[in-house]
A protein has these predicted regions:
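PLP-dependent enzyme catalytic core of the Aspartate aminotransferase-like
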Residues: 2-5, 9, 20, 342-383
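N-terminal "arm"/small-domain region of PLP-dependent enzymes with the aminotransferase-like
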Residues: 2-82, 383
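Conserved beta-loop-alpha segment that forms the PLP phosphate-binding cup at the N-terminus of a helix
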Residues: 89, 103-127, 255
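PLP-dependent aminotransferase-like
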Residues: 122-180
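Active-site pre-lysine segment of PLP-dependent enzymes
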Residues: 145, 162-173, 186-209, 213-246
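PLP-dependent aminotransferase class I/II
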Residues: 236-315, 319-322
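Conserved PLP-binding catalytic core of the aspartate aminotransferase-like
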Residues: 303-304, 308, 312-347, 363
Length: 383
């Protein structure tokens, strides 16, 4: 029988369960695909819940898209009988202007996860290795496995940060990509400018360095690194960013990579044609207007200030919270993770548990955050 993933208590999956009658397929699946863990999204509210639910499980912005962006989506949807630009030329040009790079260096796609998958597909062969920090974004090892490579997980430091020397030490002749996430999802910690420079400089030039900066807009630490500042001197560097977080466009699915033109062309060659739909392209391009960017910066600053307030309150309650620089915070409670997530759920708050490791809680509205703080205080009082 073909092994299939089975659910675990945390909602993640483990390989090894055989296909059952309920699987309904007699098709021979690639063994490595059959063994993949399923990506687990943040929990969604139950419409039948008797209490008001605060969804703090997916790192979404609590604000809707800006009015001008919604209007652009509506206008574009009226032309949905036509295909969009195949590689998002208009959006690509706008991004190149925004970041001061060449158009040929920009690749847009259906969210940053899809682009990370395309990058790995372009450079990895079966048996190759990809070095990743761990715990980090849940999709990384899945993308690596789909590309036929092997994820080499380098544990975070005790303060939930990337261990740059250990990541560099993990590089072997089979390494094709070294991945970093700053701020790191789910722990919220950053790579400083010095650490980022050390990482990029220490990776051989034939190995790709992928830096995922999905949450960069929320960073307030002046020591934080910015991968784009290293791009000119590092032809193997790829910077990943998204419109899902600060731009409030998670439902549109638009991300982009910036790298040297030859690698960008290779990534496009394995990407799905017309991969970003027409309304999504229009939304993202509009979000890059000067007025829209200014409003996004204001919103991001407000989220960061609220994050700092919440983290300070949690520490006052007695929680150990790592440096938080995204729009979320991390409670590394280990074996108590499942119980803490259930405690929050009972209080009407959906969070993202990682069984045996900790709970990630997104920053929501002030009201939602106050409810989360009250639930956290109640847990501390009982434990």
């Amino acid at each position: 029988m073909i092994p299939r993933p089975t659910p675990t208590e945390s909602g993640t999956t483990t390989p090894g369960a055989p296909v059952t009658a309920e699987s309904s397929t007699t098709v021979r699946i690639r063994p490595d695909v059959a063994a993949l863990p399923a990506y687990v999204p943040g929990a969604r509210p139950d419409a039948a819940s008797p209490v008001e639910i605060a969804k703090l499980s997916s790192n979404e912005l609590p604000f809707p898209p800006q009015d001008s962006v919604v209007e652009a989506i509506t206008r574009a949807a009226a032309g949905a009988n036509r295909y969009p630009e195949m590689t998002g030329e208009t959006l690509t040009q706008a991004l190149a202007r925004r970041w001061g790079v060449e158009v040929e260096q920009v690749v847009v796609g259906n969210g940053s996860v899809a682009l990370i998958q395309h990058l790995l597909d372009a450079v990895c062969q079966p048996g190759d290795e990809v070095v990743i920090p761990w715990r980090s974004f849940e999709a990384y090892p899945i993308c690596v496995a789909v590309a036929g490579a092997r994820a080499v997980r380098v544990p975070l430091t005790r303060d939930a940060r990337h261990d740059v020397p250990a990541m560099l030490a993990a590089i072997t002749p089979r390494t094709r990509v070294v991945m970093a996430c700053t701020p790191n999802n789910p722990t919220g910690t950053i790579l400083t400018a010095g650490e980022l420079a050390e990482l990029v400089a220490g990776v051989p030039r034939h190995v790709v360095v992928l830096v995922d900066e999905a949450y960069l807009d929320f960073v307030t630490d002046p020591e934080a690194g910015d991968a784009l500042t290293l791009l000119a001197g590092a032809p193997n560097l790829v910077v990943s960013r998204t419109f899902s977080k600060a731009h409030a466009l998670a439902g549109m699915r638009v991300g982009y990579l910036i790298c040297e033109p030859g690698l960008a062309a290779a990534i496009r060659s394995v990407s799905t044609p017309f991969g970003v739909n027409l309304p999504a392209q229009a939304a993202a391009a509009t979000a890059l207007g000067q007025a829209q960017l200014a409003r996004t910066a204001e919103r991001s600053a407000a989220i960061a200030a609220e994050r700092d307030r919440v983290v300070d309150a949690l520490r006052t309650q007695g929680w150990e919270v790592p440096e938080a620089q995204g729009n979320f915070f991390w409670l590394g409670v280990g074996a108590e993770t499942t119980a803490l997530a259930e405690h929050f759920r009972t209080a009407g708050i959906l969070v993202r548990p990682f069984a045996g490791e900790g709970v990630r809680v997104s920053i929501g509205t002030t009201s939602d955050n106050e409810r989360a703080l009250a639930a956290a205080a109640a847990w501390r009082a009982a434990h």
